[in-house]
Amino acid sequence: MKKIKTSALIGLGALGILFGRKMPGVQVIADEDRIARYSAEPVVCNGEACSFRYVTPAEGKPVDLLLVAVKATVLEQAIQDIAKFIGPDTVILSVLNGITSEEHIETAYPGRTLWSVAIGMDATRSGRTLVFNQAGKIQFGERDGAMTGRVQAVADYLNACGIANEPCSDILYKQWNKL
């Protein structure tokens, strides 16, 4: 797997802000109405303004890594909205709570999903403002536990971004353990 250079995220709630602010050049996928709201009231994290590049689903071009951070209630719409951002080598990470989002994403985009779970953060969001003491980490891996080149590429990227992470050979256990 090649080095991850380009990224996008969908969902600018607590986890989207928490991780997205550390991803250089990340594209935040949102519809035009949401982009207008985000632009009118910029995101602030621990007192610092965050600058994001917003793009509509129609403007998408394939990226190396796509982070899905939406609420479960809008996952199906998000799966449609990310279509143009998915290429043959795109890796998708979902940080939704629960154990089913990866299955939904994998059904739509076979062979592109790494299973993952976000743990240990204490982020609180009020409007466009996020406050946290502990950023937590992303645990992730192949569903079958294999330590593949794409697992290593994601770990390298997250490390370069300063996002705590843990590649796992037992990611299904880690997901269930969070419950």
Regions found by a protein language model. Give the residues of each.
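Residues at the C-termini of beta-strands that transition into short coil/loop
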Residues: A30-E32, T56-A58, L96, V117-I119, ...
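Rossmann-like NAD(P)(H) cofactor-binding subdomain of soluble oxidoreductases
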Residues: C45-T129
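Nucleotide donor/acceptor-binding cores
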Residues: I4-T6, D64, G136
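NAD(P)+-binding Rossmann beta1-loop-alpha1 motif at the extreme N-terminus of oxidoreductases
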Residues: M1-C50
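Internal alpha-helical scaffold of NAD(P)-dependent oxidoreductase catalytic cores
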Residues: F85, A108-G111, G127-L179
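Hydrophobic anchor at the start of a short beta-strand
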Residues: S7, G25-Q27, I92, T113, ...
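Short, charged/polar "capping" segments at the starts of alpha-helices
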Residues: R34-S39, S101-E103, T148
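Flavin (primarily FAD) cofactor-binding/catalytic cores of flavoenzymes
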Residues: A30, I82, R150
